[in-house]
Amino acid sequence: MRQLGRGGRCATACPCRGAGDGDAPAGAEPRDRVDLLSYGSPKALGFDPAKATRVFRYDIGRRPGFFDGKPGLWWTINGHQYPNVPMFVVTEGDVVRMTIKNTSGQVHPMHLHGHHVVVLSRNGVRATGSPWWTDSLNVEDKETYEIAFVADNPGIWMDHCHNLPHAAQGLVTHLMYTGVSTKYHLGGTPDNQPE
């Protein structure tokens, strides 16, 4: 080890990778990925999705229009732009089946607050493994999921894309229980005054 005297200087150099060393490897993706649709052994769900009392479609798309007064290509739910998107209304105890279809051109990590859902199928392929319970589901472009859950947590719950810029641009709706209301409303002056 070289020691420097008082006031001595030392120059160091760090090796740098050459151009292209950080590129992703070429070729097919590995085949050894876990597919939660078929992973594990089937188990009882505790409810029967075939006896759903509510059935909904949740089609995610895009179309030209205006949002907050700005023109653009905006997210839609069942063909409608926020705030004119459908609200999914349930009653406590309902067995709910929902088909989520994404034709928007981008991936959306969809997140339902207040509930866990079980994935029944992806692109028409039935789940055969352990029940795939989740509260967020990554829905790729051109993918369709069928999910189910029991409406067991009364409230007004947000259901939105967890890519928060997408949510801010209108990819948001609500799951609402009958008989539940709120004093809050969309738009207008907020009651709180942040510092």
Go through the PLM ranges and name each one:
Residues 117-127, 181-185:
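Short aromatic-acidic-glycine turn motif
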Residues 86, 135, 143-147:
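Short strand-edge motifs at loop-to-beta-strand transitions and within beta-strands
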Residues 106-108, 118:
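Short beta-strand/loop motifs in extracellular/secreted proteins, especially
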Residues 1-97, 101-104, 152-156, 163-195:
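Extended terminal and domain-junction accessory segments
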Residues 80, 125-132:
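Short beta-strand and strand-turn-strand segments in soluble, beta-rich domains
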